[in-house]
Swiss-Prot record:
Keyword Ribosomal protein: yes
Annotated family: Belongs to the universal ribosomal protein uS19 family.
GO cellular component terms attached to this protein's record: cytoplasm; small ribosomal subunit
Keyword field contains Iron: no
Encoding gene (name): rpsS
Segment forming the signal sequence: none
Pfam families xrefs: Ribosomal_S19
Biological function: Protein S19 forms a complex with S13 that binds strongly to the 16S ribosomal RNA.
Assigned keywords, A-Z: Ribonucleoprotein, Ribosomal protein, RNA-binding, rRNA-binding
Protein name: Small ribosomal subunit protein uS19
Domain of life: Bacteria
Length: 93
């Protein structure tokens, strides 16, 4: 169930402050965050936000199509290495 429109999008306060400071100064430094639950808002456009995936911070450049989505959607947490091919030669017996 999506969030109620009257509540507005959720963005962690510390992340919003960092974005506002950079917007007022006109700088575009990488912002490191652990807040995967924060919603991408139009104020973040053009910024690079390093989102934590549980192991490292993945840099995510915010574009117009990302507005309304969560930051965690752009930093995958699981790596799929593929299924191991069955070796028929070792199954003799």
């Amino acid at each position: 169930m999506p969030r109620s429109l009257k509540k507005g999008p959720f963005v962690d306060d510390h992340l919003l402050k960092k974005v506002d400071v950079q917007n007022s100064k006109g700088t575009k430094h990488v912002i490191k965050t652990w807040s995967r639950r924060s919603t991408v808002i139009p104020d973040m456009l053009g910024h690079t936000i390093a989102v934590h995936d549980g192991r490292k911070h993945v840099p995510v450049f915010i574009t117009e199509g990302m507005v309304g989505h969560k930051l965690g959607e752009f930093a995958p947490t699981r790596t799929f290495r593929g299924h191991v091919k069955e070796d028929r030669r070792s199954r003799r017996g």
